[in-house]
Structure formats: C-alpha cells, structure tokens
UniProtKB/Swiss-Prot annotation:
Organism taxonomic ancestry: Bacteria, Pseudomonadati, Pseudomonadota, Gammaproteobacteria, Moraxellales
Residue positions binding Mg(2+): 200, 214
Assembly, per entry: Heterotetramer of two alpha and two beta subunits.
Gene: sucC
GO cellular component, one term: succinate-CoA ligase complex
EC number: 6.2.1.5
Family under the similarity heading: Belongs to the succinate/malate CoA ligase beta subunit family.
Name of the protein: Succinate--CoA ligase [ADP-forming] subunit beta
UniProt GO BP: succinyl-CoA metabolic process; tricarboxylic acid cycle
Highest taxon, organism lineage: Bacteria
Length: 388
C-alpha cells in the first residue's frame, strides 16, 4: 500500500524528521487559501498521486501569484495524471499540496531504504545525486550510490549514519542533523512495516539546514492488520480496480499489459506460466494466483476479474491439483463461463488430483473450452487462439 506525499510527510514528521510544510487542497479556493497562508508570494504545487515522475508529466508547478494557483488547481484536480510509472490511463488527481518555498538550496541529496530480500535486511541507499530518478543514477553512475545494510538484531547504529553523512560530504552541524534524520527514518521504517522509503530530494539549504522536500512511502500490505492507523490512510481511488477486487477474495492479482489472461494455483507455477506464454510469442495480461486452498467461489471471482480487463483476448487456466481438486476447479470454470458472457477462447490445463474427472466434466459441459495436455501445449494453443 502506497501513501500520498502529504501522508508520508505527516508520518515522518511524527518521528521528528524535518519536512517541507505543505497544505492539502481539493479545489481552487482551498489552494488559494493555502497559498495566502504560506505568504502569498511563492509556493510549489504538487499533484497527489501514487506515482513518480510528476514533474515531467505536468503534475508539479511553481506558483508566484493567485492566478497561477487557480489555473493549476482548475486544470489538474479532477483529471488523471499519466507519468512513466502509470499505465496509459494514469492516476486520478483528487488533491494537490501547496508547499512552502524552500529555495534556493545548496545541494540536493537522496536517501532511501528498502527490504533487501537477498541479504534479508533493511538496506539504506544514499547519493549526492538527489532530485533525479535513483534508477537513472544506478544505471549511469552506480558508484555514486552508498549502501548500508542494517543488522536487524541491533538496528541502525549511529556510526553507520555518520559514515553515510561523511560520504555525502556533509560537514559540521549537518552531520548531526543527518544522523537524526536517518535514525528517525529507520525507526519509522521498522515500526510501520515500510516496504519502501524515499526522500528525494533531501535538500541542504543555504542556511545549512537539511530538509525533506519530497517523501515516498510504501507499506507492506501483509502488515496492515496490525497497523490500523496506517491502514486508514489507504486511498483506493489510486489502486487498480481489478487488483482491489481481487484482494477482497484473497486472490493474488497483478495487472500487466498483455492480452492473455492467466489463472493459476501457486505463485511459482503462475510465474512459469507467464514465462512460457512469452516463450511462445504471447503477452500475459496478469499474474493471478488463486492459492492452494482455492474455493469454487474464489475461482469464479478470479474468472470475472480476468475478463473485466478489456484487453484480454484469451485465457489460460493452468491448475496443478494438490490440495485443490481439479474437478472442483472444473465445476467453477463451468459455472463462471455460464455466468459470465465469455467471448474469448479459454484454454484449460489440469494436472494432478482428480485431473481426469475434471477433464471429463469440462468435455461434458458442452462449452467451447480448449483442453491442453501439458504446459507447453497449453501455451501454444492459447497464443495460437489469440493470434487467429
């Protein structure tokens, strides 16, 4: 679950981190009032969406007058912002931040942290190249990225934060400020189950103060049950409708940009299914794992979610029966096809527990389903059906 910039800043401020002050506005009148509250001379206005690249997409603008504020607010609130991190439909802009003037600045730095699954530790990253996409820095000048792994048994140590401060070229009182910021960031990360944390830019002002000008926070969705305060910040309007619907039925669904819908039980098999579809020249439209304990109802909902994607031109159902019986899956497929107006080819591959019984049920259903013998055969058939 992602947070908006204003939500992330408010959360980090609770941990004592110095953040750029901003006022949320949902219409032009509120934006003008916020602009005047901040002095009425200069402000930065930022569209609030769950995506990076807002500046290049027209989602960030400097305002030097009330007219600038009114124009920006009227033009962007209620629209959808398309950036390099969104799909072609973009994300809805329901509000903007009118933020205080923090310029000029002496330097712009980067500070971020993720859970590194290879080392099984929280890893901090810092760079002198703030204000630009960290992915671009990693690709073009990886030597400019400083990494620090945190031992979960002892947590972030002050000496680690100081080493990063020295590597960033900070001096005198700036070192102490940075240590406090990095320590607070680690505390917020652990206590709120962050999956991702970024301050970009972390600005060094001309007066020597360090300030968090932007903030990006992603929360581990699996931890929301123990984070009621954070869970209340969820903005469902920013989430993919199909992914949101899938979460209600405990389905693991991720929308992709292909045209072949996939329904599989097991994450590993689902990834293998997507790989083999691509091997045969197709493009998967989604990742969908119905899970090892899939019920008939969940399979029906999974089918509906797949077909709700208008780009889907074919469906591959790949089930390996273990805990899940193939005959139960077959019954669910039949029920779903009968309930939903299916106009695309559906290829079904069943293996394992009661696979023969499941195949028999499908054959006797009278529905236009394409049976497959093996994964390669299934992938070849669905790609051919879509291209036909």
């Amino acid at each position: 679950m992602n947070l908006h910039e204003y939500q992330a800043k408010a959360l980090l401020k609770e941990y004592g981190m110095p953040v750029q002050e901003g006022i949320l506005a949902t219409n032009a009148d509120e934006a003008v009032a916020a602009f005047e509250q901040l002095g009425g001379k200069f402000a930065v206005m930022k569209a609030q969406v769950h995506a990076g690249g807002r500046g290049k997409a027209g989602g960030v603008k400097v305002a030097k007058s009330k007219e600038d504020v009114i124009e920006f607010a009227n033009n962007i609130i209620g629209t959808r912002l398309v950036t390099y991190q969104t799909d072609a439909n973009g994300q809805p802009v329901n509000s903007i931040i009118v933020a205080e003037d923090v310029y000029p600045v002496e330097r712009e730095l980067y500070l971020g942290a993720v859970v590194d699954r290879s080392s099984r530790r929280i890893t901090f990253m810092a760079s002198t190249e703030g204000g630009v996409e960290i992915e671009k820095v990693a690709e073009e000048t990886p030597e400019k990225i400083i990494k620090v792994e945190v031992d979960p048994l002892v947590g972030l140590q002050p000496f680690q934060a100081r080493e990063v401060a020295f590597a960033l070229g900070l001096k005198d009182k700036q070192i102490g400020q940075f240590v406090k910021i990095m320590t607070a960031a680690y505390q917020a990360f652990v206590e709120n189950d962050f999956a991702l944390f970024e301050i970009n830019p972390l600005s060094v002002r001309e007066n020597g103060e360090i300030l968090c000008v932007d903030a990006k926070v992603g929360i581990d969705s699996n931890a929301l049950y123990r984070l009621p305060k954070v869970a209340a910040l969820r903005d469902k309007s920013q989430e993919n409708e199909r992914e949101l619907k899938a979460s209600e039925f405990d389905l693991n669904y991720v929308a992709l940009e292909g045209n072949i819908g996939c329904m599989v039980n097991g994450a590993g098999l689902a990834m293998a299914t997507m790989d083999i579809i691509k091997l045969y020249g197709g493009q998967p439209a989604n990742f969908l794992d119905v899970g090892g304990g899939a019920t008939k109802e969940r399979v029906i909902e999974a089918f509906k979610i797949i077909l709700a994607d208008t780009s889907v031109q074919g469906v591959l159902i790949n089930i390996f029966g273990g805990i899940v019986r193939c005959d139960m899956i077959a019954e669910a497929i039949i029920a779903a096809v009968q309930e939903v107006n299916v106009t695309v080819p559906v290829v079904v591959r069943l293996e394992g527990n009661n696979a023969e019984l499941g195949a028999k049920l499908l054959d006797e259903s009278g529905l236009k389903l394409i049976s497959a013998n093996g994964l390669s055969d299934a992938a070849e058939k669905v790609v051919a059906a879509v291209k036909a």
